[in-house]
Amino acid sequence: MPLVEYHGGGKAATIEPLKEHLPHYEQRLANLFGAGVQACFRGPQLYDSPQTKEIILKWVNFYKQHREVLDGDIVHLRRPDGRDYDGLLHVNPFGEEKGLLMLYNPLDVPIQKDISVNLYYTGLDKEARLEDNKGNKISLELNRDYTIELLVNIPPRSQQWFVIK
């Protein structure tokens, strides 16, 4: 992940200084760590202010906390097209966390909608206990086809995730 100009592109190809591009930098980190990707960062520093260091620590700690499920298989919920949410479901039927649902909003407006999520590959068959990134907990009964209907509220140009047990 280039943090500074890499193979040309000028100012448009860099997010340095990082402290002046905090939302962009955080979204890039959320995309990588939320997908279970350990990227190679190209640049002289990972952070240039206490705020950027805080963002790095937030996402590194997220990855460490959920590593077992993030390193598992991935189910794509829908083809990303830039016109609606993008969703990944990480699954690990043998772990404590059976799934981690990562949802991204590429739009400038919030996305609030009911989505259907197939939990078949999590190994769950009756009930799913979900906790979102704000600590809200909910239990949902699985339908006969292993799906749940979930109301999501994804802020603009941001993400929402749910740990599934």
Residue ranges and their predicted role:
Residues 1-136, 151-153:
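Active-site-proximal substrate-binding groove within the catalytic cores of carbohydrate-active enzymes
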Residues 139-165:
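C-terminal beta-strand-rich structural cap/linker in extracellular carbohydrate-active enzymes
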